[in-house]
């Protein structure tokens, strides 16, 4: 993984993340970017811009 230092098993300097639905090229994806499309009555899940995780919004459409 180009975002990680294999010797230390930590994210490289200048990188924000190494994996996750809201991580792209070692950086957090912009807030509001859809990371999990709506299914059924649920709304889209979107990135926060602060984490590589894709949080469930828990809201119905």
From Swiss-Prot:
It comes from the Eukaryota. GO terms for cellular component: extracellular region; plasma membrane. Disulfide bonds join 3-26, 17-23, 22-47, 35-54. InterPro entries: Disintegrin_CS (IPR018358), Disintegrin_dom (IPR001762), Disintegrin_dom_sf (IPR036436). Residues 1-61 form the Disintegrin domain. One of its GO terms (molecular function) is toxin activity. It holds the Pfam family Disintegrin. PROSITE patterns: DISINTEGRIN_1, DISINTEGRIN_2. A motif (Cell attachment site) lies at residues 39-41. It is found in: Secreted. Expressed by the venom gland. Keywords: Cell adhesion impairing toxin, Disulfide bond, Hemostasis impairing toxin, Platelet aggregation inhibiting toxin, Secreted, Toxin. Its main location: secreted. Inhibits fibrinogen interaction with platelets. Acts by binding to alpha-IIb/beta-3 (ITGA2B/ITGB3) on the platelet surface and inhibits aggregation induced by ADP, thrombin, platelet-activating factor and collagen. Belongs to the venom metalloproteinase (M12B) family. P-II subfamily. P-IIa sub-subfamily. Monomer (disintegrin). The disintegrin belongs to the medium disintegrin subfamily. This is Disintegrin viridistatin.
